[in-house]
C-alpha cells in the first residue's frame, strides 16, 4: 500500500508546479535550424579596413576635377579630398542639408545605385561664377527649388564630374557613370536601407575664397565585388 502514497519530495514538486515555481530547464543555445540574430555592426567592422586604391582614385579625381572645372567655367578652382567614411546610410543622409541636389547614378557594370551630392552652396557658387560673379554674394538656399537655369548648369557640372571620375577609375576598373534622376530630399533618394553600410567621400571646392562641398556615396554592397582591388593599391 505504501507504493500508492506520494513521498514528501514528490508532494513538494507538485506544489511548486501548481504555484509556477517549478525550475525550468536552462536553454542550451539556439537550434541549428532556427533563426539567427545578425549584428549590423559586424558588417561595419569588416568594411572599416583601409581601401588604399579607392583613396588613390579620390586623389586622382581631385586633380582631374580641378582641370575639368577650369575648362568648364574658365575659372580656377581649388579642391581637396576628405577621408573615406564608412557609416550607415541613415547617418550619411542625416548630415545633408535641405534642399540638396541628390543625383542617383548608375556605375556600370557594378550593380546598384550610387549617389552624387552637390550641396546647394556649390550649385549657387558655380552659377554665380558662370555669370561673371566671384561667389561672394550668397543666394538664399532654404525654401525653394533650383531654377531651370540652375538645373542646366548642374547637368553641365555633372558631365564634368562623370568624365573626370571615370578617368580616375580607369587604371583600376573601367566604370561608366550614367545619370538616373535627381531628387531634392534624401527621403526620395534611398540608394540603401537606413541601416545598410555605405562608403562616402567629401570633396571640398573653393572658388575665390568661397567653399562648397560635393559628396560621392556608394552602398558597400555595390563595391564589394571589387573590394580586393580597392584593398590592393596600384
Regions found by a protein language model. Name each.
Residues 1-234:
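N-terminal auxiliary interaction/assembly segments of multi-subunit proteins
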Amino acid at each position: 500500500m505504501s507504493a500508492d502514497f506520494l513521498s514528501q519530495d514528490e508532494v513538494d514538486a507538485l506544489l511548486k508546479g501548481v504555484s509556477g515555481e517549478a525550475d525550468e530547464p536552462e536553454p542550451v543555445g539556439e537550434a541549428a535550424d532556427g533563426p539567427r540574430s545578425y549584428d549590423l555592426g559586424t558588417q561595419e567592422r569588416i568594411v572599416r579596413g583601409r581601401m588604399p586604391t579607392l583613396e588613390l582614385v579620390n586623389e586622382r579625381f581631385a586633380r582631374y576635377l580641378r582641370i575639368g572645372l577650369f575648362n568648364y567655367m574658365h575659372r580656377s578652382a581649388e579642391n581637396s579630398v576628405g577621408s573615406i567614411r564608412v557609416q550607415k546610410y541613415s547617418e550619411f543622409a542625416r548630415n545633408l542639408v535641405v534642399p540638396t541636389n541628390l543625383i542617383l547614378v548608375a556605375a556600370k557594370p557594378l550593380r546598384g545605385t550610387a549617389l552624387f551630392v552637390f550641396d546647394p552652396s556649390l550649385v549657387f557658387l558655380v552659377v554665380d561664377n558662370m555669370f561673371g560673379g566671384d561667389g561672394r554674394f550668397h543666394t538664399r538656399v532654404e525654401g525653394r527649388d533650383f531654377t531651370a537655369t540652375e538645373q542646366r548648369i548642374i547637368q553641365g557640372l555633372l558631365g564634368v564630374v562623370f568624365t573626370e571620375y571615370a578617368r580616375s577609375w580607369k587604371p583600376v576598373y573601367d566604370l561608366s557613370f550614367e545619370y538616373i534622376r535627381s531628387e531634392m530630399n534624401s527621403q526620395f533618394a534611398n540608394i540603401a536601407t537606413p541601416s545598410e553600410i555605405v562608403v562616402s567621400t567629401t570633396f571640398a571646392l573653393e572658388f575665390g575664397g568661397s567653399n562648397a562641398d560635393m559628396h560621392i556615396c556608394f552602398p558597400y554592397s555595390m563595391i564589394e565585388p571589387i573590394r580586393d582591388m580597392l584593398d590592393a593599391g596600384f
